[in-house]
Amino acid sequence: MSSNLQMKILAKETAIYGMSSIIGKFLNWLLVPLYTYVLQQQSDYGIVTNLYAWTALLLVILTYGMETGFFRFANKEGLHPKTVYGTSLITLFSTSALFAILCAIYSQPIANALGYPTHTEFITLLAIVVAMDAFASIPFAYLRYTKRALPFAALKLLFVFLNIVLNLFFLVICPTIQEWAIIGAWYNASYGVGYVFVANIIATAIQTVCLLPYIIEGFKKSDTREASTLPQTYFSWDILKQMLRYSLPLLVLGVCGIMNQTLDRILLPFFYQGADAQTQLGIYGACFKVAMVMMMFTQAFRYAYEPFVFAKHKDKQSVEAYADAMKYYIIFSYMILLGMIFYLDLLKFIIAPSYWEGLKIVPIVLWAYVFQGVYFNLSFWYKLTDKTQWGAYFSMIGVVITIAIQVLFVPRIGYIASALSGAICYFIIMVLSYLIGRKHLTIPYDLKSIGIYTLITVALLGIYYLLKGCITGWNEYIFMIVGTLLFALYIVLFYRKDLRFLLKRK
């Protein structure tokens, strides 16, 4: 299969998975203005930011690399995909259930340690949510493996829709109708931020129930079209051992990787005193969310790219396809980065004005997402060569960098250092992964074009910030016009250099 055709397949799958991811993330993004405008204090949003940072870390621990392991072994010769699927399901269910039970039993000491001694129910609710999400990662991976993008997208969007509706119900509708007997009997307006977690667990439970048909499918015998000549069992200790040997290094990688993403929101409260800790975290967390468009794009690309890489890694022209994917990922990432920065004066209205003081972190976070996405693209050299320990090494280096920057500089410059820690961390491990990876798997990246687009992006940003710094008589709308012209220039250069040739490919 030619590289051009592979790029079209990747683009199609990215569009399908990306639509659900982008729409879902965007709709969830709309909860940010709801929280910042409706929750009574900035510290309330700080609680949301802090606890969801913890849940993100715990979710990676509870999946312990099995999602990627499933893709690797489901595509492996001599193994029945259904056996791999069943083994993954049973294993994840067992560990997730155990985690939820233990957290419920020890909710009080956990709540004390995290600084929420009067809200042990927050711990129990989120533990159950994390357990269900960890288990659901395998059925969702199975849907991606079997190329069933529509059910995947529908179930992802179902959760988002339910979560938004329930948040609106608890935070907006109920306060206005709590005098009704049917509402007043159970609704407590002072519970406030707690209803964010109640909405989450209800939406997650419904989504998990809807996954049941695909979970049951894993325990059905395959027909002749599904590798029926291979031995199929519901569970295999041998396969589990192989998967764990492959996936456990990915656990270290994943834990360190998610720590690089969430340590800022986990550690930040420890650098401030009293109530100011959650207030500063609330401001930081809200402004961090403004940059989520870049994360949406990276996530959409990941959904399509991971199964694409493992399925195509034996093709002779696969390395050419990987190089093209990297190039166009970077081009479109720069496009999003420029658009977000040039229109930040408009985007800032998605959060309440009391949070605007933190908008200076947005460009830094955008660059961090760009470096993170490039690092993700580079990471397949050690996944395809079964040298996943390198991913763990890079991630551990990243954690050390992240912690060092935050400990040294947050007390001096505040949450700006938290944002910088992510950008610097991903830039360093991105460079390390490229330098070491080319010794193990040769991929002909178009470094010349990537370098040119990087210089163009930096130059356009330099012009924009130079004008903003030197001209004091223009208002924000004039600068948005300037940004529009600069953005259009990038599009024109992209079209003339690459896009018109890409569109002509057959």
Positions of predicted regions on the chain:
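Signature of the first transmembrane helix
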Residues: 5-67, 95-106, 127-129, 163-164, ...
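Transmembrane helical elements of multi-pass membrane transporters/channels
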Residues: 13-28, 196-211, 215, 235-307, ...
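Membrane-proximal transmembrane or re-entrant/amphipathic helices at the cytosolic face
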Residues: 2, 465-506
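Alpha-helical transmembrane segments of multi-pass membrane proteins
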Residues: 57-58, 93, 97, 101, ...
